Amino acid sequence: MHGLARRRPAKVARETATLDRLSGGRLILGVGLGGDQFAGEFSKTGEQVDDRTRGQMLDEALAILVAAWSGEPVNHRGKHYLINDVQFLPRPVQRPRIPVWAAAFPANLKPLRRAARYDGFFPVNLEGVDEFAQAVATVRELRGNNRAPYDIAVELRPGSDVAPYAEAGATWWMTELEPGISLDQVRGVIQQGPAG
């Protein structure tokens, strides 16, 4: 997941288009707010700590990215960002744009709305499969009649039972690894491969 509100959208537009081209059109951009709860990283570096403001910055940055990936000139005058007649070329391989997955706390409606507007949902700080199922139901309701492909990712520890999450709507499973895990442990998880 990418704390997009911490970055300049024009730079991210170019970086993501390049990554999408290098990967042959396989990039998925995961975005979220991030937070200061991780050792005060935002407040200690002079970055925005207010969730609401970072949410506004994230939404504005996403609008810029979508416009930039179109290959058309971008003119944006927002509360947080300004772009005057810039054309971002080359375009990404994927059309109409690079897929965006939005992270959200399952009980927070505003980020769930954001996730519903894009291509995927990545719930964070899950308490279990029941909370996951409720969040999936909410996102599906928010998407309404939108039948475009949509992904729902879940992050679980190695050895977790994935089946209940798949039944609740998960389309992707990602392995959750603690920050202090050793390289040998990571290699072990990779070599073990997916359960089942």
Give the ranges of each region predicted by the language model.
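Active-site-adjacent structural elements that line small-molecule/cofactor binding pockets in enzymes
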Residues: M1-G196
